[in-house]
Amino acid sequence: MENAEVARVLGEIADLLELTEGNAFKVRAYRRAAQVIDLHPGSISQLWREGRLGELPGVGAHIAEKIGQLVETGECRELARLSALVPPGVLEMLRLEGVGPKTVEAIWKKLGIEDVAGLEEACRSGRILEAPRLGATRARSILGAIERHRARAGRMLLHRALGHAEAMLDRLREVPGVLRAEVAGSLRRRKETVGDIDLLVAAADAGPVVRAFTQLSGVAAVLAEGPTKASVRLRAGIQADLRVLPPESFGAALHYFTGSKSHNIALRTRAVRLGLKISEYGVFDRGGRRLGGATEEEMFRAVGLPFIPPELREATGEIEAAEAGRLPRLVEESDLLGDLHVHSRASSDGRSELEELAAAARALGRKYVAITDHSRARPLGLDAERLAEHAATIRALDARLDGRPHLLAGVEVDILPTGALDLPEEALAGLECVVAAIHSRLSDPASRNTERIVRALSSGVVHVLGHPTGRQLGTRDAYALELERVLEVARREGVALEVNAMPERLDLTDVGCRAAKAAGVPVVISTDAHDATHLQNLRYGVWVARRGWLEAKDVLDTLPLAELRRRLRRGAPARGARGR
């Protein structure tokens, strides 16, 4: 069973426990286990079979037993027990942006509303006002959340879809006769959300591959099955499509089914001008002679272009850049040396000790990590005195670690509604990495949000603007913002913008990355880790940066520590963005 499916079940158990039993300890335990498993790079099923689940943080014997049931039978008795206590539509209400378990419990138990449709009717009729602490403003907010929820229906976050795809590919590669198996579609282009999963396999005999695909453990229903292709719906709710190709056509099919449609049209138009024809079967001349198709490189070479990375294939200038020899050398995860936004247990929502974070970073090959716990505006955040003590603790541990890795003393400081920072500037001035971010009043108009950020960036003590648009994929839209104005001030003040690699954020967006590059503003790619296991999430931020045409020279945390420290000093990032 795929890691993502196990994590989904554990998360659902946590939601149901909160609604039915209210045991906060058990709820937290299941939520943490779900998060750890969702982000674990290895196979959870394999760990179970090897008796090694206990090696994962937060996975005790009780939860390990539930995971074992899932791996062995595909079912979980605890989930079935709890699901019987709650109408199916109640769980869907929990997926609405800004509608938490306490609100859902009140809506369900006080008003007898059992699904999203009933909730919408109650908001429109005013009946929702009968529930405690739910007024007219809240009703309008819930209606907006319902509208956004429906607009996003049927799409899955990149990291979850990738987890399902990789698990399926691992099984398909074990089928005798399979020469190659790859993901295609928007998932290969690393779009932040995907509507389905496209898999391509190169094999001379398609039959065994199709049969293996339709019999995978995560399949809920077979939607279509033919000699060389099949479609299934996974238990996770997303559709997966398989096509089996002869090896000589695999590259052509991989290019075609990777897309985007706009990119494919642009490339076909170029081919026509050259007297060629491109299809999913290959590149052909006017006489029907096949010029290539076994690899994507052959496809591009036949039309006089170098290989274009999948992340760029959106018809946003990549073909013109390739023709002119100006394709960027996109940043890679191996280029990154550090992580400049990491939380420890010193503030409210961090779950790992400093030593755990250092060990995890060392294992991942990181050279430096900035510890940036929350300031006092967040629950249990640090005031100036506690921040100074925490910084001293970080520096003492850094001295003992002797550069394996280096720990930098920092903070994630709130930008208050006025634009002032949550801590005095003198408390921030001695820190090596100050990440400033908005966490409140997200519904303010663009002009107010922009001026709020501009004032914060102009303070002289901020190094990085964290998760610059505040979005959370699938649950919260970005707040309104005049990005051009923010970039102008960031360049002037020497502030970098963050590409937050948290899979639920991915903020800046790819479009924002291109805008930052054009404005001469560097970015940092950071995990915003709240647990040591999150440190492996950098790849998601790297993919956003690649979609945004960024190179290593555009990303500050590709720098050796000595140069990074120099660039983080006042004004250095803006000068350096063009100088590397």
Model-flagged regions — what are they?
Residues M1-G22:
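Charged, compositionally biased N-terminal leader segments and the immediate start
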Residues A14, A24-A230, L242, G251-A252, ...:
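Accessory alpha-helical DNA-binding modules that contact the DNA backbone or grooves
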Residues A14-E21, R150-G154, I438, L442, ...:
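Short amphipathic alpha-helical interaction patches enriched in hydrophobic/aromatic residues
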Residues A181-V183, G338-V342, E412:
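Two-metal-ion RNase H-like nuclease active-site motif
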Residues L187, V413-I415:
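Hydrophobic pocket-lining residues within nucleotide cofactor-binding pockets
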Residues R190-S344, G350-G365, R376-H406, P417-R580:
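Charged catalytic cores and adjacent phosphate/nucleic-acid-binding surfaces used
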Residues A370, V411-E412:
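Core AdoMet radical
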